[in-house]
Amino acid sequence: MGTHEDTVRTLETELGLVEQGFRGLTAEQWATPTRLRPLDETKPPWTLFELAGHFDISIGLTVMLMAEPQSGQVGRDRASFFIFPRSEVAPVVYDYAYTMVEGKTPEQMPEVLAATFAKTVEGARSMAPDTVGPGYYAPMRLDEFVASRVVEAVVHGLDLTDALGRAPMCTPEGVAVTAAILDDLLARKTVAGRPPDLADDLAWVRAGSGRGPAHPDPRLPLIG
């Protein structure tokens, strides 16, 4: 596990790639559906417009954590953040992306994301790693929350490039952080140990997050 500064640097790089990925999209591309499937299969998948809204929410949670430092017992870490009842959480996350982009245009979203990403990175770099604040489900340390945002950036970055038919843009460092968190998550949710055919970190991230062909291992995917 690297230092907090290493993780912040990795997050900064991943978010920069995501921001650039959204810049310059045509109107048709903004309306491109992602491959994500809502829990309610009667609803449409997010387009890249709603995906951008989700990025603003999920990364912006870091800003909220830093804005409300608190004392008390930490309730989650970088891996356990992703343990939740999908039937309860997924519909809320799905709907909130639509709420986030309401009143905005696709052309505005790159600047919206740039502002949120900059606040996140600047704050994470300037505040103590052991700062505790609201981590959505429970209080979390800043360093643990930042690591969980790398997962968000890498996995949803795959959603962006997959929808556009582009090669993945995530860095080896970002993929390594994400893969390690998924390894930990696998051990906590079921039985530790990746399937032997998923030694490659990017292949593991795709299978563990459901961003690829369905894997026959019944333990997967770990996150949706």
Spans of model-derived segments:
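Long amphipathic alpha-helical segments that form oligomerization/scaffold cores
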Residues: S87-E111
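Short alpha-helical functional segments enriched in proximate histidine and acidic residues
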Residues: G21, S58, T62, G123
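Structured surface interface patches that mediate subunit assembly and partner/cofactor docking
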Residues: M1-L17, G24, A31-P44, A67-A79, ...
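Short alpha-helical hairpin
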Residues: R23-W30, V89-V93
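Oxyanion-binding "anion nests"
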Residues: A114-F117
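Conserved alpha-helical segments that form or flank metal/cofactor-binding pockets of metalloenzymes
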Residues: F49-V92
